[in-house]
Amino acid sequence: MIKAVAEQSGNTYMLDANVPPHITIAGFETRREDEVIEKLRCALSEQEQGTLTWAGVGAFFPNVIYVEPVLNEYLHKLSVIVNESIINIEETKLRKCYQPFQWLPHATIGKKLSEDEMVKAFMALQKSFGMFEGNVIRIGLAKTNPYEDIASWELLSKG
C-alpha cells in the first residue's frame, strides 16, 4: 500500500525514508536505551503472535494518510505490556498519545502529503483497499526522524 500511494500521489517520502509498514504502540524519549531494550526483551520473551483485522483508512490532517486496524484485546494488551515495561525507567518520558486508552492504532502509508497528493492517495486506496487480516509476528524498537531500527523481537508462534 505504501508503494501504491507513492506511485499514485507522486509523494515518495515513506519509500525514500525507508519507513517500513508498522504500528507504533508506544512513543517515548529516553537516555537509557540499553535499559529499555532489556526491559522490552524480558517483557516480550513469552509474547505470542496475534491477528489483527485491518478495517479502515483515515487521515491526520493536513498531510498523513493511514490504514487502521481494529483495536482488539491482543493489540491493547501489547500496548499495555510495552508501556508498563518502560514507564518507570529513569530519564524516560512517554508520549501521551501512544499510551493505552489514549491511542489510535494506525499504520502510516503516506506522510508529508500536499492537498493534491492526499486526494490522489485516497483515490489509490479507494481502488485497492479492502478489509484484511494480518499477523503480528515481531515487535521492533526504532528511532524516528530519520527512521532507524534499534532492536526487534520475534514473537512466539501460537500453539
Model-derived segments and spans:
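Basic, often amphipathic N-terminal segments
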Residues: M1-T51, Y74-E133, I150-G159
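Glycine-rich beta-strand-turn "strand-cap" elements at beta-sheet edges
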Residues: V57-F60, V136-D149
